[in-house]
Structure formats: structure tokens, C-alpha cells
Amino acid sequence: MLSEVLYELSTAAHSKECKRSPQQFIPAGFPLHGQLPTGTEDSASPLTTPDMVRSGRVLPTSVKSPLNLAFRHPLLYNNYDLQLKSGKAMVEIIMQYNNIVTGTFIKRPNRFIAHVLIDGRETVCHVKNTGRLREFLLPGASLLLEFHPDAALQGRKTAYSVIGVYKDNTGFEHKRRLINMDSQAPNQAAAEWLAGGGLASAVTNIKREITYHDSRFDLAFSEDGHPAFMEVKGVTLEQDGAAMFPDAPTERGVKHIMELREAALEGYRAYILFVIQMKGILSFSPNRNTHPEFADALKLASESGVRILARDCIVTEHTMKIDMPVNVIL
């Protein structure tokens, strides 16, 4: 029976239903004034492939088993619906890292690379986060890295990517917490969260990177039949159980907030989701000391109808998944 369901899902993924142009997937009621990202129509990949089904890497959500999907699935880079339904079965996409190794942080000469001790050798690694990260990228810190065995063939300059760090929290309940520091992970986790029913309302037609006026929002979807936008911000800064954003001034972040506020004033449902890339967080607040303009913009957006959400994450060495609500203090 299970094999029949999986085959049906695979067949549906390759049907003409999944061959439509991105414009046909825009939720009803979206008066988009910009252009969809280039390349989506020709380069879009189907949700699943027969090989993935036969190997057991795609399962209906009713099967409580971890999925073994590559972290950068083609789905993440097109605007096709994240949910493929066949009867009551639905494909679930869960991000997962492969070839994880551990290392010890030595130094970070610039935003993009770090020197890490791996198996006794100092190795240059790519840092998948351009933030400052000064509070946990300290000499001797224990890091998680993803090894890329085909780095040379892929044209990569480094064979390792730093994706996580263990942070010691002296005097706090979680004395050693695992923090995911991959800046690409929050958007993927947010899309999965929406597709899995993260909002209490009925969400359909989830899209990535939709252009509206002169803006591009991380997520667009239909909520109870109403068009909605969502901006996603990954949070790695934490002190004594309080998460904060940003860790450095971000004019781009202020711009995103004001654009989302404009959409809310025009009648769209608008959300900002702060994805806290760790567990054990008591509260979230904008980092007013670092960027007061960001804090002011966030409060103004909230007063204008933008819904401010914060969620912590279950983080393992191989996965990150959005979990529980966190109290937002503006």
C-alpha cells in the first residue's frame, strides 16, 4: 500500500500539473506588479523523482520517519507549490545536511572564511553566515562542518562549510547549546513550517522570492483565501535566554520591514518571522543597542498591522526544524 502511495506521488510530481508556468501558481488575488525571478519556468524541477521514491527518500507525512533529502533541493529555488497532495498524502520536505564532521575554531580572517582545526590539520572553511558572530566564534569553539567530497568538481574553493557551533552558556539552564549558523537555513525552514501547518489558518500556494512593486519578499502564500507575504530573519544572537536581532546594523533589514508595512497598509496580510536557530529561548526582541532604527521600524510595522512572530528551532547535527513560539518584546 505504501509503495502504491509513493508511486502515485511520484507520478503526480511529473504530471502536466507540475509543468505549468510560475505565473499560473500565483495565489488568487495577487496583483503582482514586478516580474517573477528569472529562470523559474525553464529550470524548475519537479517535487520528487522516481529514484527518490524508490530509495525511500520521500514519504507521506503520516509516516513518522526522518527524510533523507539533500539540503539544497531544487524545490528551494523555484516558485512551485511546496505541497503536492494525492488524496490525504502529502510530500514533506525536511532540510538535512550530509557528511557532517566536527572541528575547532581557530580564527576568522574575513566574513567568508574561517580557519578550523579538523583531524589535527588547520583547514580553510567557508562560513555560511556573513554576520559578525563574535559571541560564539571564539578560539577553541567546537564547530559543525559539512564536508563536500566533490568540492573540486563543483568549483568550490573550500571543501568544508561551517554550519553550526556549540556555545557554552555559563549560569543558564542550557549550559551548552547547539546553534545553527547557516544563513540559508531559516528561509527553507520557514517554507517547510508554512507547508506543514505552522499558521493556524489555511495556507496554500506557497511561493519563494516573489516580487511585488519594487520589493521582493521571502515568501508569498494564500491564507484563508487572502494574499499574504512573509519576510524571514534568522537569529543567532542570544544572551541568557534572550534572542536578539540584528547582531550588526542592517539598512537592508529596515527596508524590508518598511516595504512589508506598505503591503499591510494596502490590504495584504503581512508577517515577519524571526527564526531563532537554537532551542531554549525565553524571549525575542529587536537589538535596539545595535540598530535603534531597526527596532523603531519593527514597532511601527507592528502598529500598522504586520504580524511579528518568533519561533525557536530543534537543531541537531544534521537538521533544523522550526518548533515553539517565543515571546516577542518590542
Go through the PLM ranges and name each one.
Residues 92, 277-330:
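Domain-level recognition of nuclease-like catalytic cores that cleave nucleotide substrates
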Residues 67, 75-92:
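Short, positively charged and aromatic/hydrophobic N-terminal segments
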Residues 122-135:
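Beta-strand/loop nucleic-acid-binding surfaces
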Residues 198-212:
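A short acidic/basic microdomain associated with nuclease active sites
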Residues 103, 217-246, 260:
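Conserved catalytic cores of phosphodiester-cleaving nucleases, focusing on short active-site segments
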Residues 110-115:
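Short aromatic-glycine-enriched beta-strand elements
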Residues 241-251, 258-290, 312:
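Nucleic-acid nuclease catalytic cores
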Residues 14-15, 21-23, 27-29, 34, ...:
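Targeting/processing segments of secretory and organellar proteins
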